[in-house]
């Protein structure tokens, strides 16, 4: 009996060793973290999936090394992704805890381990979409919820050494020096003034356009960097033309400028770059985002009042 069962156990172990991991990203930042995580598990096989509601040059750039890339704009594509990604996995990695498609993929798949990583500032914001009471829109059609993904993750890779995190402290693994730049800025004394975009409203684009246009003019910025999911166009500004997220685009700016002055409304860039040499990051005070800005202040980020000249 011992010799008869041995091949069965061996086959089972071989199957386990051949099981792949699924890692899902939905933003350029998530894609950058996903690639980092894949390198940590370099001996393991990954299926890398990129899902986005908006496809643009930046999304294309950061998804270029992914096995499957989906622009999910309708129900048919949603079902295609769900059917194609529902499999048996060793580990499933995700960042967007309340993404309906991720909830449904996890609910329908078989897996041994759930792992997660940061989606950005939302992970450490006590009044954010991952910390507030569960909303019906954060429940998948198979019953899996945002809170299930948060509570059931075994390990969470984070950028932030914060006293609050939506994932339990003992599960956190810190990504040290994640945004460290391997470049020496040019020595010419020049400063680039940059404004980062913000999606103020999901329903009314004119709110975002008015805010951004007003402050871009008041600050007389050299460059404007749109939000990753931005669909609107801002007139009378010079766009920083690059497929890179701003943290990576600094490499290009430092070829022409010795210093970079960054303005934002509530961007997590303020956390990522606050200790970067030759970079000054300033938040623009707006009552619209009072709570979020106060939390960023608590995290050590600076905010300033910008005179509009009205």
Regions flagged by a language model, labelled:
Residues 117-119, 124-192:
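A nucleotide-sugar donor-handling region in carbohydrate enzymes
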Residues 5, 22-143, 269-271:
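Active-site and donor-binding regions of nucleotide-sugar-utilizing enzymes
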Residues 35, 78-80, 99-108, 205-219, ...:
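Well-ordered, non-membrane alpha-helical segments in soluble/globular domains
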Residues 23, 46-52, 92-95, 114-116, ...:
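Short, hydrophobic beta-strand segments that form beta-sheet elements in well-ordered domains
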Residues 192-230:
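Conserved catalytic-core segment of nucleotide-activated headgroup transferases in glycan assembly
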Residues 4-18:
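Short, Lys/Arg-enriched N-terminal segments with co-localized hydrophobic residues
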Residues 75-82, 228-276, 292-293:
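Donor nucleotide-activated moiety binding/catalytic core segment of transferases
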Residues 269-310:
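Catalytic binding pocket for nucleotide-activated donors in carbohydrate/polymer assembly enzymes
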């Amino acid at each position: 009996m011992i010799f008869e069962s041995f091949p069965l156990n061996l086959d089972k172990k071989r199957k386990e060793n051949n099981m792949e991991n699924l890692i899902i990203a939905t933003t350029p930042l998530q894609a950058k973290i996903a690639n980092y995580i894949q390198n940590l598990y370099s001996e393991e096989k990954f299926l890398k999936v990129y899902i986005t509601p908006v496809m643009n040059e930046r999304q294309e750039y950061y998804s270029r090394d992914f096995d499957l890339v989906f622009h999910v704009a309708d129900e048919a594509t949603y079902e295609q992704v769900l059917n194609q990604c529902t499999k048996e996995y060793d580990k499933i990695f995700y960042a967007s805890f309340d993404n309906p498609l991720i909830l449904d993929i996890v609910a329908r798949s078989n897996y041994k381990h759930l792992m997660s990583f940061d989606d950005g500032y939302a992970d450490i914001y006590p009044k954010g979409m991952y910390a507030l009471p569960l909303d019906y829109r954060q429940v998948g059609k198979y019953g899996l919820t945002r809170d299930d993904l948060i509570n059931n993750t075994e390990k969470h890779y984070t950028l932030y050494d914060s006293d609050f995190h939506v994932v339990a402290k003992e599960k956190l693994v810190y990504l040290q020096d994640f945004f460290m730049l391997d470049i020496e800025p040019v020595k010419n004394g020049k400063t680039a003034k940059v404004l980062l975009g913000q999606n103020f409203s999901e329903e009314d684009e004119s709110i975002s356009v008015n805010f951004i246009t007003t402050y871009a003019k008041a600050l007389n910025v050299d460059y404007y960097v749109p939000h990753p999911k931005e669909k609107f166009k801002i007139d009378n500004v010079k766009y920083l033309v690059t497929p890179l997220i701003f943290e990576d685009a600094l490499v290009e700016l430092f070829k022409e400028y010795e210093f970079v002055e960054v303005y934002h409304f509530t961007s997590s860039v303020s956390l990522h770059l606050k200790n970067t040499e030759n970079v000054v990051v300033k938040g623009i005070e707006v009552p619209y985002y009072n709570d979020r800005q106060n939390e960023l202040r608590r995290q050590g980020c600076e905010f300033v009042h910008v005179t509009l000249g009205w």
